[in-house]
Amino acid sequence: MTHEEILSMLGDYVDYLIANSSAEAPMWNIEKVRSGKPNKWNYIDGCMITACLSLYKTTGDEKYLRFSKNFIDWFVQEDGSIKTYDPKEYNLDNVNQGKNLFILYDIYGDEKYRKAIDTIRSQLLTQPRTKEGNFWHKDIYPWQVWLDGTYMAQPFYMEYETRYNKMQGCIDSYKQFMNIKKHMRDEKTGLYYHGYDESRQMYWADPVTGCSPNFWLRAMGWFMVAMVDVLERMDEQLYNEYRGIMAMLKQTIEDVHKFQDEETGMFWQVMDHPGVEGNYLETSGTALFAYAVLKGVRLGYLPKRMAAWAEKAFYGTCDRYLSKNPDGSLQLDGICLVAGLGGKDHRDGSLAYYFSEPVVCNDAKGVGPLGLAYTEMIARK
């Protein structure tokens, strides 16, 4: 396929997904579909709605805005409560969807969105923290910091503090990134480990460093996008902190790029084990890299030379995994459904574990990031 054909196909693909989805039955949320349970407020839908709102902003096509508003209005009540969401669950994943409320509030001015923003902020006010001050990833994972959590919570936190709290929490957000760099970055590769246990008690944690054993691609992807999204919401008056995160972002992209597959432009599920039996070129993390770099270049955080790395990742993913079915429907493959640490399934962070999780098609953890990268590609045209 030519690049123009890929971009046209992706536009059709997103339209197909939203035409066949609602808040009660999002076809892109494969975990929900497989569970058979009613839908809940969750980060997976949040990622997809972020992509839809970005498409609205880039294209001006109101169908993306209408869909996003209808989707979120199913959850958000007039008093600002959010159907199925409990702040006291203390799960950072549930904060992700909150970013979209700022956009809807700016467009519509409906106070229910402002109240819902405060509902989500209430979670972060009492979210348990490590002794150094980082949010626990979830209440059920005490003393643990996961890379994923930076994307889930920090952009919302930075935007709230900048807009509504006189920037009081902005330095706190910055310090959480610096703690992650201190504890979770591998000096040899420049990559970041998926998880860190401050207590060093979990079976997956190194007894000395507290880190999990491997570099999971999607966690790195979330982390790269988190830095870009936080910078976008951060006031440049915070001179040292703003430049600190920007330098961290640039160094991370440089280090990650060394692991980009030369032939396809993609990245491996476990990043530093290319070609190992069971490992595979994975869609979601590659798309997150493409999005983070393209957006970072557009906003001036990253040098323009890096855009070529992102375009190679973007088109490489589409060439390998985007296809048309005989019935005309489109399909995006190569998406790791889920990966975590600990829990009832005894997830130990080993290579065998990361290779064992299901690989699926059309899940928003891949479609959402690719949709976001697609909006950046359109913006470059």
Where are these regions (language model features)?
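Acidic/His metal-coordination segments adjacent to aromatic residues that form catalytic metal sites
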Residues: 76-83, 129, 134-139, 199-213, ...
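Oxyanion-binding "anion nests"
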Residues: 224-274, 278
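Acidic/serine-rich, low-complexity amphipathic helices located in mid- to C-terminal regulatory regions
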Residues: 148-163
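Inter-helical turn/loop segments and adjacent helix faces that build the functional surface
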Residues: 59, 108, 160-171, 230-243, ...
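CBM-like carbohydrate-recognition segments
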Residues: 2-44, 61-65, 74-92, 96-98, ...
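Long, well-ordered core segments of solenoidal/helical folds
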Residues: 7-26, 66-83, 115-134, 167-196, ...
